[in-house]
């Protein structure tokens, strides 16, 4: 079976638009940002609150010669509306920056705000992916909240799919939200 990152990339690849905008709401080590930059998007925007994430991502993008169309933002994803008014593809990889302090994680309080704003900015026929990690305390809160929240989204506006390993209780999962129509 493919790894979560491969699955998310396969899904996002299907939504690439040559004049579109993609957003990585949780930059981390920059692998999703790099993937989006390598696609046919006109612009890629990536957020993280940790300067270390920006430095790692910038180095990765420079090494791969993909920095030109990417805007790296050191700010919380809950402030996305100061930088983004609309986008076609977006991804949240909730949790913590690998190989760093696991106490610094995304928080449900700010993640709720960010996802709400992202849904408002998501273009018709665009997709928003939420990668949920219930294996740590804050991640469990986020997973529980977003799985319930997704059920309440209007079906005339959104199509929603949850991809999960059924026999691994704390395995990461992907919530795929496609906008069908404006509300």
Positions of PLM-derived features:
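S-adenosyl-L-methionine
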Residues: 1-20, 31, 55-85
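Class I SAM-dependent methyltransferase core
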Residues: 24
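Conserved SAM-binding loop of SAM-dependent methyltransferases across substrates and taxa
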Residues: 29-41
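Conserved SAM-binding motif I beta-strand of class I
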Residues: 43-48
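Mobile active-site "lid"/loop adjacent to the S-adenosyl-L-methionine
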Residues: 94-114
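Conserved beta-strand signature within the Rossmann-like core of class I S-adenosyl-L-methionine
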Residues: 121, 125-132
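Class I S-adenosyl-L-methionine
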Residues: 139-183
